[in-house]
Amino acid sequence: MDKLSVNHLCGYGLEVPDLKVASDFYTAFGLRASIAEDRLLMQTAHEGPSELIAIQGLEKRLHHLSFGIHASDMPKFEEHLKKIGSPTTASPQKGLREGLWFQDPWGTWINLTPTTVIQDPFKNLKVPRVDRHLWRELPKEIKPNRLGHMLMFTQDWEKVEAYYCLALGLKVSDRAAGKVSFMAGGSGVRDHHCFGLINSTHRGFQHSSFQVNSVDEIGLGAMQMQKAGFTDGFGIGRHALASNLFYYTRDPWGSWIEYYADMDKISDSWQAKDWNELPYVWPQWAPEFWGKEMNANHERK
């Protein structure tokens, strides 16, 4: 059981007060939308389970997390979760997602669904530039490749980190000491993180991040969102931890969505570190914005 691990974050669910508002926002971002009963199913260009399921609710709230596992690990996870006191149970809503369902000790629903391991959709980052006009070949519409990661606000930050490592086999890849824990799943070479925990007073959704191919696609995605009327955002920039390029847009409920590219990869030999001071790479963000806006948990306790 010591090597049992989820492979990656394959989806999440949000309760939202208006599915039409959600559809307009996420389709502007480049996701495909379809309606199923009282929920909105959103997918990237990647084939597989819906990366985002928006469910009709009274207000915006994090509804569930979904992680991909090997099909052969399903019975192993079921046994493992029972042993640690988090037995699997029925889905909170019929037909929501396939696989195993359980609640963590703080009440958040978690789904484990059998999927194939996600690979980067591009093999060569170096685009030949001899005798060609690159600008003429850039995409007219940005459609993200896949869901890369999401961050969740939580109370009991250290206990939650320990539980998610135990229950899901996630591995801490780096920490902003006392503030944020970045976590990776699976084995071999993979993204620096697929999930993260932000120290807060209670649970909540902070942001999700979707991969695109280049800095050009991030910039074009930012323009795409602004043209659609979603002008509250920041970037383009490069993070310190994970080193990825980014652009964030605020969603209609005060949380965030991100285009990202060019993230650090880690291997099984990677050693996590606690960082007490993190430099701003570029741009020079205002610390009060990062603290009061980006990390504001708007969900009720």
Where are the predicted features?
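Conserved short beta-strand elements that form part of the metal-binding/catalytic scaffold
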Residues: 31-63, 71, 109-116, 171-206, ...
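Non-heme Fe(II) oxygenase catalytic core, chiefly the N-lobe of the double-stranded beta-helix
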Residues: 116, 131-165, 169
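Vicinal oxygen chelate
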Residues: 1, 8-17, 56-143, 146-155, 181-182, 229-301, ...
